[in-house]
Structure formats: structure tokens, C-alpha cells
């Protein structure tokens, strides 16, 4: 497969993901179900290892994992981050996405859920912003890859987050 064919396949795959997410948004009125559906789509279509949506608790600066893949219920319960705390909290604070090519080498990565085992994994985290307020974050783990591939994934996740902000 040529590089051009690979890029075309990736574009088709991403378009399919966006279409499926939009269909679920049109049908789903429960936020938790919608977030779980989106994670299912991402797991099926792009093969994420681990992923989590953390939403801001009402009237607080704490973000709590609302939906996750690749984590046990206990690991998910441990996923609570204050604004500015760790990478997820910094994304919530700044409203800017974060890309960590290798979490084992980043001292800011808290591994609060304790769901990672020290393998060479990239961590991508994007803010979910509605009316200029960060209402949540979406993070994924994926095998480490060249920086340009990770940056492309981060941009795609940002697009997914922007679309979801309207449904959350």
C-alpha cells in the first residue's frame, strides 16, 4: 500500500467515525450513554488501547471519569483530577490539547487510575469546550508512533471533542 493509499484509507476511516458519532448524537439524549457509544466507536474503528472521558462536576473544579475503555471499574473510580493537576488537569485548566509521546518518560503523567504498566505508550488529551468553558476532557492511550502521526491523531480527537461539546 502506498503512502497516498494509506492516507486515503485513514481519511475514509475518520469520516466513518465522525458519521457514526453524529448518528449517535442525533439518537442519544443521555450523556453517559453517548460518551460510552463514542468510546465504542473509537475502539472499534481506530483501535484505541485505553480511553476516558472526564466531565467537570457541577459547581466544582474536579473532573471525574464518566466513561472509559480499557480500565476496570476501580481504575475508573480513581480517575479524578483537579484543575491543573497532572496532564488531564492541565488540559482542563488551559483549554489546550496535550500530547505525550511516551508516558513512561513524562513526570507530569500521574497514572492516577493505575491502569498502565510502563509500556511505551503515547497519551493524547483534549479539552471538551462548550461556550468557551471546559466541560470535560477526552484522553486516549495508543502505541507510541512518529510525532506527525500522533499530532494527526490529536487534531482528529480535537474535532471529535468539538462535535461532542454540542451534545454534552
Model-derived regions, located:
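Signal-transmission linkers at sensory-effector interfaces
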Residues: 1-33, 44, 135, 167
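GAF sensory/regulatory domain recognition
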Residues: 40-43, 50-79, 104-105
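Short beta-strand-to-loop transition segments that serve as allosteric relay/switch motifs
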Residues: 71, 137-148
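Signal-transducing coupling segments at domain and membrane junctions
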Residues: 73-74, 101-122
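Acidic/proline- and glycine-rich, intrinsically disordered low-complexity segments
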Residues: 74-98
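A short, aliphatic-rich beta-strand micro-motif
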Residues: 121-129
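Sensor-regulatory modules in signal-transduction proteins
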Residues: 128-131, 145
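Allosteric cytosolic regulatory segments
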Residues: 154, 158-165
Amino acid at each position: 500500500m502506498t503512502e497516498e493509499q494509506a492516507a486515503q484509507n485513514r481519511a475514509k476511516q475518520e469520516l466513518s467515525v465522525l458519521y457514526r458519532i453524529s448518528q449517535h448524537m442525533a439518537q442519544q439524549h443521555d450523556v453517559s450513554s453517548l460518551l460510552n457509544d463514542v468510546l465504542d466507536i473509537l475502539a472499534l474503528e481506530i483501535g484505541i488501547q485505553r480511553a476516558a472521558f472526564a466531565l467537570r462536576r457541577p459547581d466544582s473544579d474536579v473532573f471525574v471519569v464518566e466513561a472509559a475503555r480499557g480500565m476496570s471499574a476501580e481504575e475508573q473510580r480513581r480517575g479524578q483530577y483537579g484543575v491543573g493537576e497532572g496532564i488531564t488537569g492541565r488540559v482542563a485548566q488551559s483549554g489546550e490539547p496535550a500530547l505525550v509521546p511516551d508516558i513512561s518518560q513524562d513526570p507530569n503523567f500521574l497514572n492516577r487510575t493505575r491502569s498502565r504498566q510502563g509500556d511505551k505508550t503515547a497519551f493524547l488529551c483534549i479539552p471538551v469546550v462548550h461556550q468557551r468553558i471546559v466541560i470535560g476532557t477526552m484522553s486516549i492511550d495508543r502505541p507510541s508512533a512518529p510525532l506527525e502521526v500522533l499530532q494527526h491523531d490529536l487534531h482528529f480527537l480535537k474535532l471529535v471533542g468539538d462535535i461532542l461539546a454540542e451534545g454534552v
